Amino acid sequence: MNGLDKIIARAAEGCVCKESREKLLAIEPQCDPDEVRYALEQTDAINSLLIKNGSPRFGGVEGVSQLAARAVKGGVLSMGELLMVAGALRNFQNLVSWYGSSEHDALPTDDLFYALAPQPGLEQQISSAILAPDAMADTASHTLNELRKKIRATENSIRDRLESMVRNMDTSKYLQESVVSIRNGRYVVPVKSEYRGEVSGIIHDVSSTGATVFVEPQAVVEANARILQYRAQEAQEIERILVAFTGQVAAIEPQFQYSYKAMLEIDVLLAKARLALDMKAFKPTVRTDTSFSLIRARHPLIDAKKCVPVDISLGREYDSLIITGPNTGGKTVTLKTAGLLCAMAQCGFLIPADERSEICVFDEFLVDIGDEQSIEQSLSTFSGHMKKITGILELAMPHTLVLLDELGAGTDPAEGAALAVAIIEELRRRGVLLMATTHYAELKVFALET
């Protein structure tokens, strides 16, 4: 049903993580009553917690499961990847705190939240040591801190010497401008090309015009070399820290994967619950027989202010419901409402209907619904209509909900009515629950007499 796809897509917008969004978009109606009941209870539990506690602090992460798996295989995680791991660990902690922020009895979601292993120590270590995907804090280790102190001290010494040089009247006359810059990781001064021999040092670059050569004065060559040495040692120390953090991630990989999977499930439930709040939806009772009763049901895709609630019952007193009335009278909306709400519930969504509503679990939803405001009474429409009906008859069986809009339309009224009666009788013989709309008076009589 296209309507169900739209509802699922709308709910998926509430997912924080891309992986859980994809998981929700792939959801399909469940056919086991116990699974449907459990899924509804989980969504209802999270819905109640959202009302009590508000939304949890929960940031989007993506592909972190693969990062943990790579750590186990010996790959070294980058700073950005470690920050993603820390973000996931922070999510675990925030979800645990949110779940425990209000007292409640045992809930069907307990196992998901108890599966979360936050590892606050590791999360804090990573977050303190790594400031950004390309920036590690000086305090990440004592060695790194000492190396950076040496780098800064040496750089300051070089700048002081070069700035003194560019201010010196005897030297400045050879310079293109009085600035200190960096070329190839070395501090240099811009010397006029014609005076290159007047400033002793190593040429590292030439301007595009050839008018300027960038010279590393001999006085700072040794200091520049020390900086390069310190930079190499700095890179080695950063790599050592990354290897150490990666090892810690690898050590918790089994718990992390279990927690990550639970987090994605929770994200899906939060998205479902947010949709329920938005729709003012409730948990229906799941019946074990083949009958349902929707009380004050509203079409989930129509503005609640414009939607007229409707009561729909089927399967107890009668197995087929024929809806008649003029165009724009709401017949098609009623069909769609019944089908969508039953399918929503089987996907674990709360439904926009009174909490006294009851649903059953169908194995199939067989639908032929058009737009009652633009039905073309033509041979091509009738042919397409009959092709769909033929397909429905091939699949119809007990525990199936069949929804037919304008049954028999598109042909001679007398023939259409007779055909519609024959189709209804065959579907009833197959043991389906059937809802159909019609304009034919003959079907009204048939419904009353059957």
Predicted regions and their residues:
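Conserved amphipathic alpha-helical "coupling/scaffold" segments
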Residues: 1-143, 147, 252-255, 259-273
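Long, charged, glycine-rich C-terminal linkers/tails
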Residues: 166-183, 273-296
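ATPase nucleotide-binding head domains, primarily ABC-like/P-loop NTPase cores
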Residues: 279-280, 287-450
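Divalent-cation-assisted or electrostatically stabilized phosphate/pyrophosphate-binding catalytic cores
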Residues: 212-213, 218
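Extended, Lys/Arg-enriched charged tracts that mediate electrostatic binding to polyanionic substrates
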Residues: 145-195
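Extended, charged coiled-coil "arm/hinge" scaffolds of SMC/Rad50-like chromosome-maintenance ATPases
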Residues: 118-134, 222-243
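Non-transmembrane, heptad-repeat alpha-helical coiled-coil rod segments
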Residues: 231-265
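Gly/Lys-enriched N-terminal cap/neck module of very large, oligomeric protein machines
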Residues: 7, 185, 189-205, 213, ...
